[in-house]
Regions:
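Short hydrophobic/aromatic, small-residue-rich stretches within specific transmembrane helices
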Residues: 50-54, 174-178, 200-201, 205
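Accessory recognition modules or surfaces
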Residues: 13, 23, 56-58, 180
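Hydrophobic alpha-helical transmembrane segments of multi-pass integral membrane proteins
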Residues: 169-188
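Juxtamembrane transmembrane-helix boundary motif
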Residues: 1-22, 27, 31-43, 64-151, ...
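Short acidic/polar alpha-helix capping motifs at helix-coil junctions
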Residues: 54-55, 119-124, 179-181
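Transmembrane alpha-helices of multi-pass small-molecule transport proteins
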Residues: 49-64
Length: 248
């Protein structure tokens, strides 16, 4: 196994990415995937690497969110199976189709979602409950997350908050489900590719595991309005940046 010279830096990237993801419920996969892609790692290997690390970081994060009671059991169950199925299908497709063909549509969706989230803060609209749309959301998010190497939290968390779910439960539940989605995606890609950058996986998960408990504590103490605003801003920036990058 070849150890990349960027490993020490990737530990810091893993810490920062998980801190953002644990506090705001998004950003880990996207941030880590962007770095690996910049380093020239192929999309399928990038997705496998990030999801392998995410199995550990999401596991620690899920336990932390459960401790602080940030998980909504009903929403968790509605997202779980569809999310796993979507992840497996997306991983299978990624092994044969370039990811860049679908990324522009993902970024456009995120831009629209961010505006919905921010409008709820400004207009103070009445919260909505996540009902039958939960399974569809999980399936779509799991599929796109596998294709792009990340994005589950960005799609699921922002959509749930846009529908009126309290940020702490949207973030905690999203982090809990991604553990299973990441595991399914990682195993699917590993079985089809037969290779993975274990040195990068280790670097990302060391940094991420250290940040997870801190992020869960912050989530349970941040006011709902502030957390919602943060989610909207982060999604807008990620969406705008990603769309601009893919179209230029």
């Amino acid at each position: 196994m070849t150890v990349a010279p960027e490993v020490p830096w990737l530990i810091a990237v893993g810490f920062a990415a998980q801190l953002i993801d644990g506090c705001v419920g998004m950003g880990y996969g996207i941030s880590a995937s962007a770095i690996l892609t910049t380093l020239g790692v192929p999309p399928a290997v990038t997705s496998a690497t990030v999801h392998a690390a995410e199995v550990v970081t999401a596991g620690v994060s899920s336990a932390s969110h459960a401790w602080f009671r940030n998980i909504d059991r009903r929403i968790f169950l509605s997202l779980l199976v569809p999310g796993v199925i979507g992840g497996v299908l997306g991983a299978t497709l990624l092994a044969h189709v370039p990811a860049h063909t679908v990324r522009p549509f993902v970024w456009a969706y995120l831009l629209v979602t961010s505006l919905i989230v921010l409008s709820r803060v400004i207009l103070k609209r009445t919260p909505l409950r996540v009902g039958a749309q939960g399974p569809a959301l999980g399936a779509v998010a799991g599929f796109l997350d596998a294709i792009g190497g990340g994005g589950w939290g960005t799609i699921v968390t922002s959509t749930m908050i846009a529908r009126g779910v309290a940020p702490r439960f949207a973030i905690g539940t999203s982090n809990a489900v991604i553990f299973f989605v990441a595991l399914a995606t990682c195993l699917t890609l590993w079985l089809q590719l037969g290779t993975m950058r274990y040195d990068m996986v280790l670097a990302l998960l060391i940094g991420g595991a250290a940040a997870a408990p801190i992020a869960a504590w912050v989530t349970s103490h941040v006011p709902q309005r502030a957390a919602t605003t943060a989610v909207g801003v982060v999604v807008f920036v990620l969406g705008a940046t990603g769309l601009f990058t893919t179209l230029t």
